[in-house]
Curated annotation (Swiss-Prot):
This is Protein pelota homolog. Signal peptide: none annotated. PANTHER family: PELOTA (PTHR10853), PROTEIN PELOTA HOMOLOG (PTHR10853:SF0). It comes from Methanobrevibacter smithii (strain ATCC 35061 / DSM 861 / OCM 144 / PS). Keywords: Cytoplasm, Endonuclease, Hydrolase, Metal-binding, Nuclease. One of its GO terms (cellular component) is cytoplasm. The lineage of its organism: Archaea, Methanobacteriati, Methanobacteriota, Methanomada group, Methanobacteria. The gene is pelA.
């Protein structure tokens, strides 16, 4: 993501989303009530006399502005749609006051105007810009003749696989089995190489296959081995990938990786709750009480709860009192766990009555 123009006095920012992660960030930065301008396409009724064209209309591309009423981000399709009332545009093509949905597209400028940019929103915008300069990490989870890949994105984990091999279960050394293992490993490597600019690779799994795979890439693909570390897990597949995240392995490699940081924060919160600690609050009532008392050391808020009620001001209050605010994605296990706790929680500086 890059900022093209910024007018702090008017509360206007023009930026260009460049990745799927940028669209995810924008889905939380844009709020109901914001004014958004962008290029859009709309089917306009054609009255030139061509009946077929008149029935279907013709697609026209133009710039318009809407006051946002609804924001939807579809993680599986990677589409960000903003729906609202049209306040500016070519009046010969669209009636002002009607509703329209803008689909935010990659590499297309979008202008956002807010009455006031909250601290958390500016912070998130800066995080998105910085994160776009950084490289991703990938977890390769191996078990027998099956591999699952977990690509670390800022919005969550993107899974690929399973990648299946045809390795015999017989633990005997023969040419056919060795050939099948090599073919399986090359199949996994081919899948990993589909993703460009991967800085860190975690080779993980419950058995010895991970070690064998690591030895293989050390001999055959040194460029990958130089980026890789080994991690043990108790399970295979997606469950094993979550184990790696909970251990903080990826966070150690990519400190700025958002998903790993969020998972570690949620894990720390759950540990405090498990110890019946008095320095923790969760649920709206208890968390807001702690914020108003200035007792919050770290506030965790589910992304879907940010736009609710006075949450933006509460987040600013925490930061103004030198507390840390972390918005947790609802697209991974940690987000689901926070949702079960009332969508917000806090680690406290001291006990409160």
């Amino acid at each position: 993501m890059k900022i093209v123009k910024q007018d702090k006095k008017e509360g206007i920012v023009t930026l260009v989303p460049e990745t799927l992660d940028d669209l995810w960030h924008l889905s939380h930065i844009v709020e109901v009530g914001d004014s958004v301008s962008s290029k859009t396409t709309r089917r306009i009724q054609d009255n030139t006399g061509d009946k077929l064209r008149s029935d279907r209309g013709v697609k026209k591309t133009f710039t318009l502005r809407i006051d946002v009423e609804n924001i939807t981000f579809h993680i599986f399709t990677g589409k960000l749609r903003l729906t609202g009332v049209i306040t500016k545009g070519p009046e010969d093509l669209i009636p002002l006051g009607s509703h329209h949905t803008v689909e935010v597209k990659l590499n297309t400028p979008i202008t956002i105007k807010k009455e006031k940019w909250a601290n958390w929103a500016l912070k998130r915008l800066n995080q998105a810009i910085e994160a776009s300069k950084k490289l991703a990490a990938i977890i390769v989870l191996l078990e027998d003749d099956t591999a699952t890949l977990g690509l670390m994105r800022q919005f969550g984990i993107e899974y690929y696989g399973p990648i299946k091999g045809s390795v015999s279960g017989k633990r005997i050394v023969d040419k056919n089995r060795s050939k099948a293992i090599a073919q399986f490993y090359e199949k996994v490597i081919e899948s990993v190489n589909k993703f460009h600019d991967i800085q860190n690779i975690v080779v993980a799994g419950p058995g010895f296959v991970k070690n064998d795979f690591y030895d293989y890439i050390k001999n055959k693909h040194k460029d990958l081995a130089d980026k890789a570390i080994i991690e043990s897990t108790g399970s295979g597949g997606r469950v094993g990938i979550h184990e790696v995240l909970k251990k903080g392995t990826v966070e150690k490699l990519t400190v700025e990786n958002r998903v790993a940081s969020e998972m570690v924060a949620i894990n720390n919160l759950l540990e405090e709750i498990g110890k019946n600690s008095s320095k923790v609050a969760y649920g709206e009532k208890e968390t807001v009480k702690a914020i108003n008392l200035g007792a919050v050391k770290q506030l965790l808020v589910l992304d879907s709860a940010v736009a609710i009620n006075d949450m933006g001001n509460l987040m600013d209050m925490v930061e103004n009192m030198n507390g840390e605010v972390m918005v947790i994605s609802s697209q991974h296990e940690g987000g689901e766990q926070l949702k079960g706790l009332g969508s917000m929680a806090a680690i406290l500086r001291y006990e409160i009555a």
